[in-house]
């Protein structure tokens, strides 16, 4: 599930 605020689907904080 993409729930990040990096611009797109990323793994900043799962």
UniProtKB/Swiss-Prot annotation:
Keyword Kinase among UniProt keywords: no
Modified residues (N4-methylasparagine): 3
GO CC aspect terms: extracellular region
NADP found in the keyword field: no
Residues the record lists as Proline amide modifications: 14
Crosslink feature (Pyridine-2,5-dicarboxylic acid (Ser-Ser) (with C-10)) location: 1-11
Locations listed in the record: Secreted
Record location of the Thiazole-4-carboxylic acid (Cys-Cys) cross-link: 9-10
PTM: Maturation of thiazole and oxazole containing antibiotics involves the enzymatic condensation of a Cys, Ser or Thr with the alpha-carbonyl of the preceding amino acid to form a thioether or ether bond, then dehydration to form a double bond with the alpha-amino nitrogen. Thiazoline or oxazoline ring are dehydrogenated to form thiazole or oxazole rings.
Crosslink site: Oxazoline-4-carboxylic acid (Cys-Ser): 12-13
Residue numbers of 3-hydroxyphenylalanine PTMs: 8
UniProtKB keywords: Amidation, Antibiotic, Antimicrobial, Bacteriocin, Hydroxylation, Methylation, Secreted, Thioether bond
Cross-link (5-(methoxymethyl)thiazole-4-carboxylic acid (Val-Cys)): 5-6
Cross-link (Thiazole-4-carboxylic acid (Ser-Cys)): 1-2, 11-12
Main location as per UniProt: secreted
Sequence position, cross-link 5-methylthiazole-4-carboxylic acid (Asn-Cys): 3-4
Chain residue numbers at which the record places covalent cross-link Pyridine-2,5-dicarboxylic acid (Ser-Cys) (with S-11): 1-10
Sequence position, cross-link Thiazole-4-carboxylic acid (Phe-Cys): 8-9
Family: Belongs to the thiocillin family.
Extra facts: Strain ATCC 23866 also produces this antibiotic.
Protein name: Thiocillin GE2270
Organism: Planobispora rosea
């Amino acid at each position: 599930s993409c729930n990040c605020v990096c611009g797109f689907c990323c793994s900043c904080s799962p």
